[in-house]
């Protein structure tokens, strides 16, 4: 297996490599938060690419245990049901890049799988808005379907640029695709002018 030959824990590592070759997100010295990290392929790539002076600032998060990776801090928690545990672990830390390769267990029904992954994307976006530095970037995996455009519009509130990207290493027949948001904007006022904000009922 190619991933094992190159020392990566999963073939998904090549997806992040493809994404970074296109968008140049993982620059030296940047701080990275990796959501849904297990088994660790993305965290490995991130740590390699942002390392500076032998050190990297990468925090990996997953509900499942993960074997240690050099230069990666691991937080084991369920961000869907216990996000307060992650907040307690991170405290007031801020990141330049938030990555999410999270995916629910597939039930085999395309529409249900799509709705479930959109829920995870929304949760990842909430955490990105909370922990990103101004100007930062966000990458999340989605499955194409009914709610993808609505979610894309949510990203556009927070990022100056939102782009679809399908890595070369993704299977061509898969509905999996990534959304990449760059230039995180207005972290304190995500809707820009007050008239753009949704009204309260």
Curated annotation (Swiss-Prot):
InterPro entries in the cross-refs: RNA_methyltr_RlmE, RNA_MeTrfase_FtsJ_dom, rRNA-MeTfrase_E, SAM-dependent_MTases_sf
Catalytic reaction(s) noted: uridine(2552) in 23S rRNA + S-adenosyl-L-methionine = 2'-O-methyluridine(2552) in 23S rRNA + S-adenosyl-L-homocysteine + H(+)
Main location: cytoplasm
Organism of derivation: Anaplasma marginale (strain Florida)
Enzyme class: transferase
GO terms for cellular component: cytoplasm
Matches recorded under Pfam families: FtsJ
Name of the protein in its database record: Ribosomal RNA large subunit methyltransferase E
């Amino acid at each position: 297996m190619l991933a094992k030959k190159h020392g990566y824990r999963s073939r998904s590592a090549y997806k992040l490599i493809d994404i970074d070759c296109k968008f140049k997100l993982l620059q030296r010295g940047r701080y990275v938060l990796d959501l849904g990290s297990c088994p660790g392929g993305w965290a490995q790539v991130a740590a390699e690419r942002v390392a500076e002076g032998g050190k990297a600032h990468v925090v990996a998060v997953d509900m499942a245990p993960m074997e240690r990776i050099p230069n990666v801090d691991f937080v084991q928690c369920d961000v869907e049901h216990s996000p307060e545990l992650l907040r307690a672990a991170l405290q007031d830390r801020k990141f330049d890049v938030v990555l999410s390769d999270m995916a629910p267990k597939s039930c085999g029904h395309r529409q249900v799988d799509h709705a479930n992954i959109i829920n995870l994307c929304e949760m990842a976006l909430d955490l990105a808005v909370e922990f990103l530095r101004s100007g930062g970037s966000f990458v999340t995996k989605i499955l194409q379907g009914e709610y993808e455009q609505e979610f894309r519009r949510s990203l556009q509130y927070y990022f100056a640029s939102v782009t679809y990207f399908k890595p070369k290493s993704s299977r061509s027949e898969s509905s999996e695709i990534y959304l990449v948001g760059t230039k995180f904007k207005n972290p304190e006022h995500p809707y820009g002018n007050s008239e753009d904000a949704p009204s309260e009922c």
